[in-house]
Amino acid sequence: AIGHLENFSSDDAILGALAKGGLGDAFMQLNQPGDALGFYESAIAHNNNEYTTPKFLYKAGVTAIELGQSEKALQYFERIKNDFSDSDEASTIDAFIGMAKSGN
């Protein structure tokens, strides 16, 4: 899957972000959260939209917590709360903000 996604190219902003995020998911499955976080960050930067951005901000935040990067996680979670308050991810984001603030 990684080889196919790395070679994927699309002019569509959402598909491009989904491909980068898919690479992040693949690296999480391989227990390589550092690599996964890089791809989630790439997916976030690829295109700012209401569909993929909060999804990958959430995944990046959870991954950052796993890596012990609570401050980074807090930034991702607060961006969801502030910029994507209508997203599905925002419905439970306060709990994740609390987790990041507590350093867990």
What feature does the model see in each segment?
Residues 7-17, 44-53, 80-93:
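Short solvent-exposed coil/turn linkers within tandem alpha-helical repeat scaffolds
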Residues 89-104:
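Extracytoplasmic/luminal low-complexity segments enriched in Pro/Gly and acidic/polar residues
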